[in-house]
Structure formats: structure tokens, C-alpha cells
């Protein structure tokens, strides 16, 4: 009986470590973070603050995508920018095109959801 009690007492720190019964995780979550609104309002940017990256630019058409390694930056006919996931393909040549920041957004491949597909959808052709 006493042996079981000792084992239970020795196991409590391990349980606390894995399951955070001490409530330390909740304390970490209460740290104050700067809101998106505050970061935009307190920006030194004299131009346009891009909504997803908070970078300063001359206008929305210059904003980059938040995840450029996995997204294509498509510019619509009205100059708005839409970020889409790069097409998933096993074709190395196509992957190289989509990984190129200049060629990727201009690629128009039939049957692939790339910037060409986005433009067609914008025009109501899809």
C-alpha cells in the first residue's frame, strides 16, 4: 500500500510535465501580442501596407504572397492580387516553371489550376 503511494507521488512530476496539470501553459497564453490593426496603424509606411505580410508597397498589386515558396502570386485583370497554392504535379519541368517567380505567375497550362485558371475563373469562363 505504501509502495503504491510512493510510486504515485513520484509519477506526479512526470504527469505534470506531460499533461501540464500545474496550469503553466495557460499562463503562457496570456502574453500580450500586438494586434494586426495596431501593427498597421503604428507602421511607418507612407504607402500601402500589404494585408498578409505587413510589407510597405506602392499599392496592392505589389504585395507578395505570405508563403512564396508554396504559393503563386496571380494578378487579376483589375490589378488585384490573389495568392494560390502552387499546382501539385509530378512533372519536374512544370514544377521548375512554377518555382520561378517570373515565369510561374505567367504560366497558362491547360488542365492545371494555375494563374491562367484563376484568370479564366475571374472572367467567368470556368
UniProtKB/Swiss-Prot annotation:
Keywords: Signal
Protein name (Swiss-Prot/TrEMBL): Long chronological lifespan protein 2
Coiled-coil zones: none
Keyword Ribonucleoprotein: no
Superkingdom classification of source: Eukaryota
InterPro entries assigned: LCL2 (IPR034543)
UniProt record similarity statement: Belongs to the LCL2 family.
Disulfide bonds: none
Organism per entry: Eremothecium gossypii (strain ATCC 10895 / CBS 109.51 / FGSC 9923 / NRRL Y-1056)
Function: Probable component of the endoplasmic reticulum-associated degradation (ERAD) pathway.
Encoding gene (name): LCL2
Signal sequence segment: 1-16
Amino acid at each position: 500500500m505504501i509502495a503504491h503511494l510512493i510510486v504515485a507521488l513520484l509519477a506526479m512530476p512526470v504527469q505534470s510535465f506531460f499533461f501540464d496539470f500545474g496550469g503553466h501553459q495557460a499562463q503562457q497564453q496570456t502574453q500580450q501580442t500586438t494586434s494586426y490593426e495596431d501593427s498597421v496603424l503604428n507602421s511607418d509606411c507612407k504607402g500601402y501596407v500589404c494585408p498578409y505580410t505587413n510589407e510597405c508597397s506602392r499599392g496592392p498589386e505589389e504585395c507578395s504572397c505570405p508563403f512564396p515558396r508554396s504559393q503563386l502570386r496571380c494578378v487579376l485583370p483589375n490589378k488585384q492580387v490573389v495568392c494560390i497554392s502552387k499546382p501539385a504535379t509530378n512533372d519536374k519541368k512544370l514544377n521548375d516553371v512554377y518555382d520561378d517567380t517570373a515565369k510561374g505567375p505567367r504560366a497558362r497550362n491547360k488542365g492545371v489550376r494555375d494563374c491562367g485558371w484563376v484568370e479564366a475563373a475571374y472572367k467567368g469562363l470556368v
